[in-house]
Swiss-Prot record:
Protein name: DNA-directed RNA polymerase subunit beta'
Record function comment: DNA-dependent RNA polymerase catalyzes the transcription of DNA into RNA using the four ribonucleoside triphosphates as substrates.
Reaction it catalyzes: RNA(n) + a ribonucleoside 5'-triphosphate = RNA(n+1) + diphosphate
Enzyme Commission identifier(s): 2.7.7.6
One GO CC annotation: DNA-directed RNA polymerase complex
Cofactor detail note: Binds 1 Mg(2+) ion per subunit.
Protein residues bound to Zn(2+) 2: 814, 888, 895, 898
Domain of life where this protein originates: Bacteria
GO terms assigned for molecular function: DNA binding; DNA-directed RNA polymerase activity; magnesium ion binding; zinc ion binding
Pfam families on file: RNA_pol_Rpb1_1, RNA_pol_Rpb1_2, RNA_pol_Rpb1_3, RNA_pol_Rpb1_4, RNA_pol_Rpb1_5
Keywords, in A-Z order: DNA-directed RNA polymerase, Magnesium, Metal-binding, Nucleotidyltransferase, Transcription, Transferase, Zinc
Cofactor: Mg(2+); Zn(2+)
Subunit organization: The RNAP catalytic core consists of 2 alpha, 1 beta, 1 beta' and 1 omega subunit. When a sigma factor is associated with the core the holoenzyme is formed, which can initiate transcription.
């Protein structure tokens, strides 16, 4: 018996494999898989329920229905194993062979495989160089195709209709051969000689001139080469033998009531068999051609339906009018094999329940209901009960557990001790959505969750449910404890800040404790230590907020690393002294000697983690939470209606605003302003009124007047509950309080435009009907948004994960000197992100020098931690080059140095860390959060009043960046370039502020002038866009004809008239081709030139432009010739944000992208065509000039004769990432995408580290286009993996040959996922059919490098703890294989087993 067990063990061993190859199956291969031909469409006998012989479920072909029993019942039991019954022909074996044995159908006529025919581009079509239409006409018997022209004038592959064929027959007789149907295509494919074709095409390629033809030939060449290298034969795309799926994979299940539930595949197979048999019969009978043809066509159609129903023509439907599910449908889509069963599997040993708060738990614990624990840990309990001798058998143990005898609970306590469980809350958006805890048994039926981990789970207690999973094996428990325990996940992987920060009640309690109150009870007392202060508080001598002096003892570490105690007397409050009791030793008292808002608490925890490490932080966090809850309870903070204090100034402010609006209304009626301007100005007035009201309200709420000890009135921060909640960051914001006690403000319509009548009431006063109706708009839009956007965001995350899944840290250092240049991010007067935040946790790529010296401050390859960042800041360095994954040189992964610090752990990243997936989660998770948070301000329009000037905040020197300007008659500069920026530089040369200023800005200062803080240095009109004259002279109207290209509007009040240019669409036919413009002429009537160029000064006027000058009026430099009214602005919401992020990662081209200069040189304009201008750039070195056609309505930033640099903006618009990559290089495109994505998230106050976005960009840049193939195997213009090209180039250089040159290409994340090397990963993502077709034709083999492929084949992933397993496998594969025991074939194994069994049987 021992031998038998040993043998069975041997059999169950899985095969080790290095990769998975996919290819086309030849007819012989299909027959070799098969165990017999299926000849009849019958399935099972309806009376006996036994499978019919030679039918679709035949036991002879596919194996027995019952274990070790033949169909007729002659041979039963194990001892007859392997015998083939002579009566029914069934082999006696296990029934599970019915899952793996295949059959086949011999087709009476060949049939084209629909995937290779219809999946675009059609492979059969490319192969034969025929159009898909023609091939379909042949296959579906509509026309003939010439196969062998013989000596006739026909050509091979020529199409002949029925008439043509008959004519040809009369003319040539049997000189030639023409056929129809799949046989014809089969013969054509068979006739292709791959090698000859390849040679011919390679020779032909260089001489082809037309671009389209070259592309076509290259495509065909690649296909034929793929066939040639993979060993596939083209004729295998036509099926002669059809494999039949094993019956247990397409089951037929009897239901009660004599009906059957069946898989759709059985119906599809039955159709094929029926038609095939009929066709055989017709051929035997030598039926008329037309009937046979029809039958063949029907056979082709039924095989099409079986393989991919609905790909051609209408889908075949079953009895219930629903399309049948074909083989292709089985594997694709969310319910297909890949996503349903291979990537997402269900878990046993899990339970779920509602969660409640566990305020008394420690951070590493969760409360598990006893009932649940008993069920989840059953096998462990049975084992323990048996082991302790309390139960004799498993059955007895089961009875004990069912009766719930007291011993069971003791055993359960034992089993659970130190056995972590994992809690998961759906949706699991990032890795913190599953964490491990030690269970604590509780009564009741709800799981208790520690409040501090709620932020990570995004959980609240309004009915959320969570799932519990039990790690069973020792390794799983170890991993759960060391990697997933909640105490080991304190920092967020997205930004490296603590994720277990207290929120809400805890913050409120701590804030309340640390506040000070003037003249509180016990003010001015002095205490010898904290304990004495506590005594005074407990006995009621001093209150919590009293300002007192306390002597405190601190422990600090000195230079030598010894712990030193210091004592000092501090001005503080009793509450803060109490807080210092829970402060871990080694932290400064100053950290709690302040008002503890949410930000301060977060900083406190962060400092604690960096200075004292994990353990102290965890304990401290728990203590903070207990204290916070305690004092929040004691504080008695509550919200009452009287807490919402409405400021007295509100009513006067609203009245003023109303008066202003009336004034503008009058101006509009008298024609001084256009409708658009009026709307914009009204909105501005209300926006600023709203600001003023909310300022007044906050001033009113935040301060209260009290009498101090000396009897003098003094202001102090108020103890108003609502104000405390908002100020501490516990709940609510100024914007929400404004709606309660200020005014609701402007509301947005569902389309995002702003309703111009604001809601002046607030919630305390209450809204009237019309106000209520307006506010429902915004609120409803928010709810609808949420529903739609959640799905969108989930899809974005899925695409991100898919593109980045195979990126893993695989080596220590790639040694590159490349990197990204980091500067502080400055927008307007604020430093949005200082340099230290951008470089923290990165590795320096090149030595950083002390400013102005040659002294190295930070050597290359230093990991910048907090201490280094302090040094960088102290030396006022404002740019440095740091390593980045984008410039990492590692093939198939990245190195530790280029990635830098692991944000969730605080040290340099480990090998094997799956940085791709972490990056995708970090970007996707807040996406979902944000989309869910659109409506929280109730749709209140969050738009500040439009800016119309620049007011500096710091003193310094003014610098202009890419600005062109003219000096007007008052000696002031007027900006005449589009993308100009002002910067303020301090005396150390560091940039402090940077502002974008529009065209037409008037500057109050000159360049390099000193400016002082608070000064206004630039002004412009935000509502109109001027056209500025660059020369002085008099104006002359061209093509300005009243009623044709423009109309006059006269103001009734002032009698002033202005000219409004009509849009092309509004003009009569005569004016369509005209181009209204203003030309400047000198006194003598001659044309004036723009200074420094040969271009006449003429300005084209777009539609809607308003001109306030008359013909021949004089004009000065820098004066406005015309104004173009600007459109009203829409509110910025992440709604615009999420699609924006998706567009950036998909690298979509914007609608009207900016036009960039393709080469450096001088601008001129060539001959104009209808509606387009011809822009010509002539390079300075006399190279080939570059031409581009630009639509006339595009506003150009350049004039004739101007010099431009490559990549400079010629016409404004959103820049396209592809253009930036092509013209400005890889680093610029990386910076562009990172900054744009960050802008969207920053607007919502979400922090994501730049690294994560860079990781995605690296994956978008992993393909390149070959420019010149050199001596390599690549084709020019082909798309290849960058790492492949680099490896090939290294080999070529080593042999002294010419390497290939290439240009990097930017692919959107969907395209990049589908273009990955691994076809398994691509097929499980999207477009399964296309990916598999392509892979099969090319005979691709998947090396199983990524995570997804390994999950699909059921292995450990090559990351995390599975990394070492894969390393070992790779090493073992590299070693020469040791001599192994000779492998035995399956049939020998069966034989051996049969012998063993017979032995065992005869010994019985």
């Amino acid at each position: 018996m021992k031998d038998l067990l040993k043998f069975l063990k041997q059999q169950s061993k899985t095969e080790e494999f290095e990769g998975i190859k996919i290819g086309l199956a030849s007819p012989d291969l299909i027959r070799s898989w098969s165990f017999g031909e299926v000849k009849k469409p019958e399935t099972i006998n309806y009376r006996t329920f036994k499978p019919e012989r030679e039918g679709l479920f035949c036991a002879r072909i596919f194996g027995p229905v019952k274990d070790y029993e033949c169909l007729c019942g002659k041979y039963k039991r194990l001892k007859h194993r392997g015998v083939i019954c002579e009566k029914c022909g069934v082999e006696v074996t296990q029934t599970k062979v019915r899952r793996e044995r295949m059959g086949h159908i011999d087709l009476a006529s060949p049939v084209a495989h629909i995937w290779f025919l219809k999946s675009l581009p059609s492979r059969i079509g490319l192969m034969l160089d025929m159009t898909l239409r023609d091939i379909e006409r042949v296959l579906y018997f509509e026309s003939f195709v010439v196969i062998e022209p013989g000596m006739t004038s026909l050509e091979r592959g020529q199409m002949l209709t029925e008439e043509n064929y008959l004519d040809a027959l009369e003319e040539y007789g049997d000189e030639f051969d023409a056929k129809m149907g799949a046989e014809a295509v089969l013969e054509l494919l068979r006739a292709i000689e791959l090698e000859k074709e390849i040679e011919m095409m390679r020779e032909e390629l260089p001489s082809i001139n037309s671009e389209t033809r070259r592309k076509k030939v290259t495509k065909r060449l690649k296909l034929i080469e793929a066939f040639f290298t993979s060993g596939n034969k083209p004729e295998w795309m036509i099926l002669k033998v059809l494999p039949v799926l094993p019956p247990d994979l397409r089951p037929l299940v009897p239901l009660d009531g004599g009906r059957f539930a069946t898989s759709d595949l059985n119906d599809l197979y039955r159709r094929v068999i029926n038609r095939n048999n009929r066709l055989k019969r017709l051929l035997d009978l030598a039926a008329p051609d037309i009937i046979v043809r029809n039958e063949k066509r029907m056979l082709q159609e039924s095989v099409d339906a079986l393989l991919d129903n609905g790909r051609r023509g209408r889908a075949i439907t079953g009895s219930n009018k629903r399309p049948l599910k074909s083989l292709a449908d089985m594997i694709k889509g969310k319910q297909g094999r890949f996503r349903q069963n291979l990537l997402g599997k269900r878990v046993d040993y899990s339970g779920r329940s509602v969660i409640t708060v566990g305020p008394t738990l420690r951070l590493h614990q969760c409360g598990l209901p006893k009932k649940m624990a008993l069920e989840l840990f059953k096998p462990f309990i049975y084992g323990k009960l048996e082991g302790r001798g309390l139960a004799t058998t498993i059955k007895a143990a089961k009875k004990m557990v069912e009766r719930e005898v007291p011993e069971v609970w003791d055993v359960l306590d034992d089993v659970i001790r130190e056995h972590p469980v994992m809690l998961n809350r759906a949706p699991t958006l990032h890795r913190l959505g599953i964490q491990a805890f030690e269970p604590v048994l509780i009564e009741g039926k709800a799981i208790q969750l520690h409040p501090l981990v709620c932020a990570a789970y995004n959980a609240d207690f309004d009915g959320d449910q969570m799932a519990v999973h039990v790690p069973l094996t020792l390794e799983a428990q170890l991993e759960a404890r060391s990697l997933m325990m909640s105490t080991n996940n304190i920092l967020s992987p997205a930004n490296g800040e603590p994720v277990i920060t207290p929120s809400q009640d805890v913050v409120l309690g701590l804030y309340y404790t640390s506040r000070e109150r003037i003249n509180g009870k016990g003010e001015g007392m002095a205490f010898s230590d904290v304990a004495e202060a506590e005594k005074a508080y407990r006995t009621g001598v001093a209150e919590l907020h009293a300002r007192v002096k306390v002597r405190i003892t601190e422990t600090a570490t000195n230079e030598a690393g010894e712990k030193v105690k210091t004592r000092r007397i501090v001005d503080t409050t009793v509450g803060r002294a109490l807080l210092s009791q829970i402060l871990p030793k080694g932290l400064s008292y100053d950290l709690v000697n302040q008002n503890m808002g949410k930000k301060q608490i977060s900083k406190l925890l962060n400092t604690c983690y960096r200075q004292l490490g994990l353990k102290d932080t965890v304990i401290f966090a728990d203590q903070l939470m207990y204290t916070g809850f305690h004092f929040a309870t004691i504080s008695g903070a509550s919200v009452g209606i009287d807490d919402m204090v409405i400021p007295d100034e509100k009513y006067t402010l609203v009245a003023d605003a109303e008066a202003e609006v009336l004034e503008i209304q009058e101006q509009f009626q008298s024609g001084l302003v256009t409708a658009g301007e009026r709307y914009n100005k009204v909105i501005d007035i209300w926006a600023s009124a709203n600001e003023k009201v909310s300022k007044a309200m906050m001033a009113n709420l935040s301060k209260e007047t009290v009498v101090n000890r000396d009897g003098v009135e003094e202001q102090q921060e108020s103890f108003n509950s609502i104000y405390m909640m908002a100020d501490s960051g516990a709940r609510g914001s100024a914007a929400q309080i404004r709606q309660l006690a200020g005014m609701r403000g402007l509301m947005a319509k569902p389309d995002g435009s702003i309703i111009e009548t604001p809601i002046v009431a607030n919630f305390r006063e209450g809204l009237n009907v019309s106000q209520y109706f307006i506010s429902t708009h915004g609120a409803r839009k928010g709810l609808a948004d949420t529903a739609l956007k959640t799905a969108n965001s989930g899809y974005l995350t899925r695409r991100l994960v898919d593109v980045a899944q195979d990126l893993v840290v695989i080596e220590d250092d790639c040694g590159t000197f490349e990197g990204l240049t980091m500067k502080p991010l400055i927008e307007g007067g604020d430093v949005v992100e200082p340099l230290r935040e951008r470089v923290l946790g990165r590795v320096v790529a090149q030595d950083v020098f002390k400013p102005g010296t040659e002294e190295v401050l930070v050597p290359r390859n230093t990991l910048l931690d907090e201490a280094w960042c302090d040094i960088v800041e102290d030396n006022s360095i404002d740019e440095m080059i740091v390593r980045s994954v984008i410039s990492c040189d590692t093939d198939f992964g990245v190195c530790k140095a280029c990635y830098g610090r692991d944000l969730a752990r605080g040290h340099i990243i480990n090998q094997g860390e799956a940085i791709g997936v972490v990056a995708a989660q970090s970007i996707g998770e807040p996406g979902t959060q944000l989309t869910m948070r659109t409506f929280h301000i109730g749709g209140a329009a969050s738009r500040a009043s439009a800016e119309n000037n620049v007011q500096v905040k710091n003193s310094g020197t003014l610098k202009l960046h890419n600005a062109k300007y003219v000096t007007n008659s008052n000696g002031k500069l007027v900006i005449v370039s589009r993308s100009s920026e002002l910067a303020i530089i301090d005396e150390l040369g560091r940039e402090k502020e940077r502002y974008k200023v529009p065209y037409g800005t008037v500057l109050e200062k000159l360049e390099d002038d000193g400016v002082s803080a608070g000064e206004i240095i630039a002004k412009w009109d935000p509502h109109t866009h001027p056209i500025i004259s660059e020369v002085a002279g008099s104006i002359k109207f061209v093509d300005m004809i009243e009623g044709v290209t423009m109309t006059r509007q006269t103001d009734e009040l002032t009698g002033l008239s202005s000219i409004v240019v009509l849009e092309v669409g509004q003009r009569p036919t005569a004016g369509k081709e005209m181009r209204p413009m203003i030309r400047l002429v000198a006194a003598d009537g001659g044309d004036l030139m723009i200074p420094g160029t040969e271009v006449p000064a003429q300005y084209f006027l777009p539609g809607h432009a308003i001109v306030n000058l008359d013909d021949n009026a004089p004009i000065n430099v820098g004066d406005a010739l015309a104004r173009i009214p600007q459109e009203s602005s829409k509110t910025r919401d992440i709604t615009g944000g999420l699609p924006r992020v998706a567009d950036l990662f998909e690298a979509r081209k914007p609608k009207e992208p900016a036009i960039l200069a393709e080469v450096s040189g001088t601008i001129s304009f060539g001959k104009e065509t209808k509606g387009k201008r011809r822009l010509v750039i002539t390079p300075a070195d006399g190279g080939e000039h570059y031409e581009e056609m630009i639509p006339k309505w595009r506003n150009l930033n350049v004039f004739e004769g101007e010099k431009v640099e490559r990549g400079e903006v010629i016409a404004d618009g959103p820049e396209a990432a592809h253009d930036i990559l092509r013209l400005r290089g890889i680093h610029n495109v990386a910076n562009y995408i990172v900054n744009e994505v960050q802008d969207v998230y920053r607007l919502q106050g979400v922090k994501i580290n730049d690294k994560h976005i860079e990781v995605i960009i690296r994956q978008m840049l992993r393909k390149c286009e070959i420019v010149d193939a050199g001596d390599s195997e690549f084709l020019p213009g082909e798309q290849a993996e960058v790492s492949r090209v680099k490896i090939a180039n290294r080999e070529l250089e080593a042999q002294g040959k010419q390497p290939a040159t290439f240009e990097r290409e930017l692919l959107g994340i969907t395209k990049a996922s589908l273009a990955t090397e691994s076809f398994i990963s691509a097929a499980s993502f999207q477009e399964t059919t296309r990916v598999l077709t392509e892979a099969a034709v090319g005979g691709k083999s998947d090396k199983l490098r990524g995570l997804k492929e390994n999950v699909i084949v059921g292995r450990l992933i090559p990351a995390g703890t599975g990394y070492s397993y894969h390393q070992k496998r790779a090493e073992a594969a590299a070693k020469p294989a040791a001599t192994e025991a000779p492998a035995i074939s399956a049939s020998e194994a069966e034989q051996n087993l049969a012998d063993l069994l017979n032995l065992a049987g005869s010994n019985d």
